[in-house]
C-alpha cells in the first residue's frame, strides 16, 4: 500500500481506546450500510482480500437478491455476488449486524431536497443506526458525498450521543467514494482513496483499513478537506461541461464547428483537458453534488457561489436546447414537431450502463411530449422506461424504427450502436454526442 499525506502526522498521536480488533468481540471486519453502486463494490473488494463482510440495506428486494446470488449493480456481476456469498458475505435489513463489525462504512444516497438543498436524511438515519449499536474500538467511515463539515457537525454529534467519544473511544473518518460506473480500467482498488480523519488516530485507523484492498491512500488534513476534495472533483467537471455546452450554442450562431475546435485544442499537450458538449448532465454526482457546495456557501457565508450556479443554469437548459434544435430540424424537413414520431437512442446517463439516474433523456422526453410529439426509445441496456409515471414505448426492431420514425435523436452513444449504420438508415438523425460526422446528420 502506498500512502500520500498532506502533512506529517507528528510525533504524538492520542491513543484510541482499544486498537483494531482488541477488546472488540466483532465477528466480522466490515459492515457496509447501503448496498448500491458504491457499497456493493466496496463489499466485493473487501471480501476479495479475505475480510469477513456483512451488508445492511433497507430494501428487502435488494437483500433477498444478493443473498440469492443476484446482483442489481452494473459493475458487480452475479458471479461476483455468488463468490461473495461463498466467502461468507450476507446482506441484512436488520441493523443488529452492525455491532458485530470492527469497521462500519456508510454508503447511502445524498440526494437533493424538494427546495434544492441537501437531503441528509439517509446519512442521519444510518448514523443513528450505527450509534445505537456503537461499541468501543469501532471505526466508522462516511463515504456519501456531502458538504464540508458534515462528518464533524452532523455525524460526530449523533455518534457521541451513545456516550462514546470520537478520537478516544471510537474512530470516525470521511473517505469520498470515487466509483465511476462502467469504468473497467479504474475500479475501487486502482483509484487512489482520499481519507480524512477527525483526529490523527482516526486517520491512522482509516488508512490502515482501506490499505487492505486499495493500492494507494491519499491522507487529507482532516474530514473537511476530504469532503471538499470530492465536491471539487465533481464541480470541476460540472463547470467545464457547462463551458463547452454554452460554446456549442454560441458556435452554432457564429457558424463555427465546435467539435473541430475542441479536437484541435485537445492536441495541446499541456494546460488543456477536452470536455465535449452533451444534451445535459446526468448521474447522481454531477447534477447533484455542486448543489451541496452552493448550499454550504450560502448557509455559512451568506452569499452565492455564482460560478457553480451559472453552470447549473446552463446545463439544466440543454434539454430545452436539444428539443428546440430537433424542432428546427423537422421544420427544415417540412414537418412540425407536433404529431411527429421521435425515436430516442440511448436513454441512460452514460454509455454502456443501465443507470437512468438524472438522465437528460427524461427532460428531453417531457419537453417533446409537451409539444405533442410521439416519443419512443431504444436502449440495449434498458428494457422498460417511464417518465412522470407514463411508460415510453420501447422499439424492438431498431432498423425498422430508424426508417419509420420522422426523427431519431442519439442521446447516448452506447458501444452497441453501429454509428455508420444509424446514419445510413435513419431518415433524419440528430447526433447530440458528436460521434457521426456525415452529410445529412445534424450534430449538436
Question: What are these regions, as identified by a protein language model?
Answer:
Residues 2-444:
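Structural/interface elements that position substrates and couple domains in central-metabolism enzymes
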Amino acid at each position: 500500500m502506498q500512502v500520500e499525506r498532506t502533512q506529517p502526522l507528528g510525533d504524538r498521536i492520542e491513543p484510541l481506546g482499544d486498537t483494531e480488533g482488541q477488546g472488540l468481540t466483532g465477528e466480522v471486519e466490515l459492515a457496509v450500510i447501503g448496498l448500491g453502486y458504491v457499497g456493493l463494490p466496496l463489499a466485493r473488494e473487501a471480501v476479495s482480500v479475505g475480510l469477513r463482510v456483512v451488508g445492511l440495506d433497507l430494501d428487502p428486494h435488494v437483500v433477498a437478491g444478493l443473498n440469492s446470488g443476484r446482483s442489481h449493480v452494473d459493475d458487480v456481476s452475479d458471479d461476483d455476488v455468488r463468490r461473495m456469498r461463498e466467502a461468507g458475505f450476507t446482506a441484512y435489513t436488520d441493523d443488529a449486524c452492525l455491532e458485530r463489525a470492527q469497521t462500519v462504512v456508510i454508503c447511502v444516497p445524498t440526494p437533493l431536497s424538494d427546495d434544492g438543498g441537501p437531503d441528509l436524511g439517509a446519512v442521519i438515519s444510518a448514523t443513528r443506526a450505527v450509534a445505537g449499536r456503537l461499541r468501543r474500538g469501532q471505526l466508522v467511515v462516511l463515504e456519501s458525498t456531502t458538504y464540508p463539515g458534515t462528518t464533524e457537525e452532523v455525524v460526530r454529534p449523533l455518534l457521541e450521543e451513545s456516550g462514546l467519544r470520537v478520537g478516544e473511544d471510537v474512530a470516525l473518518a470521511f473517505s469520498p467514494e470515487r466509483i465511476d460506473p462502467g469504468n473497467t480500467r479504474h475500479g475501487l482498488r486502482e483509484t487512489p482513496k482520499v481519507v480524512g480523519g477527525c483526529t490523527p488516530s482516526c486517520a491512522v485507523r482509516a488508512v490502515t483499513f482501506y490499505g487492505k484492498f486499495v493500492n494507494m491512500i491519499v491522507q487529507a488534513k482532516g474530514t473537511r478537506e476530504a469532503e471538499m476534495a470530492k465536491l471539487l472533483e465533481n464541480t470541476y467537471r460540472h463547470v467545464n461541461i457547462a463551458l463547452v455546452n454554452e460554446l456549442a450554442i454560441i458556435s452554432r450562431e457564429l457558424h463555427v464547428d465546435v467539435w473541430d475546435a475542441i479536437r484541435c485544442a485537445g492536441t495541446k499537450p499541456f494546460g488543456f483537458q477536452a470536455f465535449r458538449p452533451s444534451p445535459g448532465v446526468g448521474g447522481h454526482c454531477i447534477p447533484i453534488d455542486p448543489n451541496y457546495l452552493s448550499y454550504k456557501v450560502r448557509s455559512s457565508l451568506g452569499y452565492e457561489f455564482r460560478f457553480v450556479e451559472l453552470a447549473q443554469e446552463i446545463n439544466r437548459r440543454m434539454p430545452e436546447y436539444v428539443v428546440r434544435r430537433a424542432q428546427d430540424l423537422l421544420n427544415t424537413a417540412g414537418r412540425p414537431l407536433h404529431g411527429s414520431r421521435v425515436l430516442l437512442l440511448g436513454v441512460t446517463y452514460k454509455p454502456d450502463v443501465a443507470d437512468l439516474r438524472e438522465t437528460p433523456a427524461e427532460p428531453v422526453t417531457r419537453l417533446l411530449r409537451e409539444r405533442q410529439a410521439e416519443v419512443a426509445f431504444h436502449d440495449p441496456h434498458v428494457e422498460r422506461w417511464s417518465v412522470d409515471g407514463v411508460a415510453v414505448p420501447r422499439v424492438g426492431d431498431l432498423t425498422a424504427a430508424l426508417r419509420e420514425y420522422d426523427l431519431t435523436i442519439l442521446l447516448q452513444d452506447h458501444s452497441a450502436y453501429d454509428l455508420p449504420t444509424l446514419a445510413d438508415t435513419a431518415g433524419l438523425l440528430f447526433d447530440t454526442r458528436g460521434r457521426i460526422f456525415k452529410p445529412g446528420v445534424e450534430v449538436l
